[in-house]
């Protein structure tokens, strides 16, 4: 099975190890992974800021980039959710709208792909930690994915997963929201950090780098000893340990 990796901006620039873990996971389950180098941002920051004309150009570029892919997989529910906006964005151009629909049909967030396409039953990973999981807004509300990450995490050996209070609430990142509405964003992330602390977790797991960056930054400034881990890193943890 051939898979094209959609790495996303944040993983590419700030969290390259997330890309490595994603590739290693996919290869472990028999996938042949390719990385189309011409890929760019999905266009979400421009789209959320109202620059829809510019976003259309990005959307068409990404549609072209992954046109020949069998499957497209990304370690970000938020960016995959943005692909779902392309169809509406290009509604006045039927040919491009149809191409956008085809892209969406073959694009998956990592945990979705592992559970729903590869039908993974065992993850063969271990993490001796008390952790909690942050459900990102875009992945939950726009992509509609709520269960796959938990299906995988419950199979990680040694992982004690605690329920995060009010897990459905936003962490305050929201892409450009955290820049445009900084005071509100800060209050939201402070509330999220309080809920994380209530669980007594040593590790916060998430499937979107933006959320992890926002929450992790706040936790670091508060001097709290809570580690941020992307879902891909957790699922690949034992493999990395063996290599080291």
Swiss-Prot record:
Cellular-component GO terms for this entry: cytosol
Entry's Gene Ontology BP terms: lactate metabolic process
Domain of life: Bacteria
An example molecular function term from Gene Ontology annotations: oxidoreductase activity
InterPro entries given in the database record: Cys_rich_dom (IPR004017), LutA (IPR022822)
General function of this protein: Is involved in L-lactate degradation and allows cells to grow with lactate as the sole carbon source.
Family: Belongs to the LutA/YkgE family.
Protein name: Lactate utilization protein A
Species of origin: Halalkalibacterium halodurans (strain ATCC BAA-125 / DSM 18197 / FERM 7344 / JCM 9153 / C-125) (Bacillus halodurans)
């Amino acid at each position: 099975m051939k898979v094209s990796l959609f790495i996303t901006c944040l993983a590419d620039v700030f969290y390259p190890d997330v890309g490595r873990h994603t590739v290693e996971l996919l290869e472990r389950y028999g996938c042949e992974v390719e990385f189309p180098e011409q890929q760019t941002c999905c266009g979400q920051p421009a789209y959320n800021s109202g620059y829809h004309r510019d976003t259309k150009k990005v959307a068409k570029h990404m549609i072209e980039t992954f046109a020949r892919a069998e499957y497209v997989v990304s370690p970000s529910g938020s960016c995959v959710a943005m692909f779902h906006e392309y169809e509406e964005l290009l509604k006045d151009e039927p040919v491009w709208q149809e191409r956008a629909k085809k892209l969406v049909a073959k694009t998956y967030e990592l945990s979705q792909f592992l559970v729903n396409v590869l039908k993974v039953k065992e993850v063969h990973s271990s993490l001796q930690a008390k952790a909690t999981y942050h459900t990102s807004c875009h992945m939950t509300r726009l992509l509609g994915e709520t269960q796959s990450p938990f299906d995988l995490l419950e199979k990680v050996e040694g992982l004690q997963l605690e329920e995060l209070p009010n897990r459905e609430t936003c962490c305050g990142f929201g892409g450009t929201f955290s820049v445009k509405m900084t005071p509100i964003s800060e209050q939201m992330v402070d509330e999220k950090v309080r809920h994380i602390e209530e669980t007594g977790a040593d590790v916060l797991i998430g499937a979107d780098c933006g959320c992890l960056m926002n929450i992790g930054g706040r936790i670091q400034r508060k001097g709290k000893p809570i580690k941020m881990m992307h879902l891909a890193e957790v699922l690949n943890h034992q493999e990395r340990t063996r290599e080291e």
